[in-house]
Design a protein with these regions (language model features):
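Rhodanese-like catalytic fold shared by cysteine-dependent sulfurtransferases
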Residues: 1-37, 45-86, 94-138
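Short, surface-exposed ligand- or partner-binding patches at beta-edge/loop junctions that are enriched
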Residues: 89
Length: 138
């Protein structure tokens, strides 16, 4: 018997968008210029490598989000312990809405997400830096 999904992705994203702030790329650029935000890139590392990233953005995949936010987790990241606004983005705006809602539900505040994601950032003329893989010394 096939699974019956009772709440699909559209309902989940709509719920997230109703709960959290959605910012335009221009608003994110303005906030980033002031330096009082952390831009969180939740795209897969392969997407970042292929498409580049917003300069200064902190990369955190969706799979590690809760573990990196929780200060009591052995995987907690200092980037999530700052008294700043957290603006999440993905490629198109759906995953970042879900990530921002999760962060908000965990108590990380204030949070927002960038509507339209990285595609909207590029279209708005936002700065993009090429992916620079970490190198190891022999």
């Amino acid at each position: 018997m096939a699974q019956i999904i009772t709440r699909g992705i559209k309902a989940l994203v709509d719920e997230a968008n109703a709960q959290i702030e959605t910012m335009t790329p221009q608003q994110v650029m303005s906030a980033a210029a002031k330096g009082d935000v952390v831009i969180v890139d939740i795209r897969d590392p392969r997407e970042i490598e292929r498409d580049g990233r917003i300069p200064g953005a902190f990369a955190c995949t969706r799979g590690m989000l809760e573990f990196w936010i929780d200060p009591n987790s052995p995987y907690a990241k200092p980037a999530f312990q700052q008294d700043k606004k957290y603006i999440f983005h993905c490629a198109g705006g759906m995953r970042s809405a879900l990530a921002a809602k999760t962060a908000d539900d965990m108590g990380l505040k204030p949070v927002a997400h960038m509507g339209g994601g990285f595609a909207a950032w590029k279209e708005a003329g936002g700065d993009i830096e090429a992916f620079a893989p970490k190198t190891t010394k022999a």
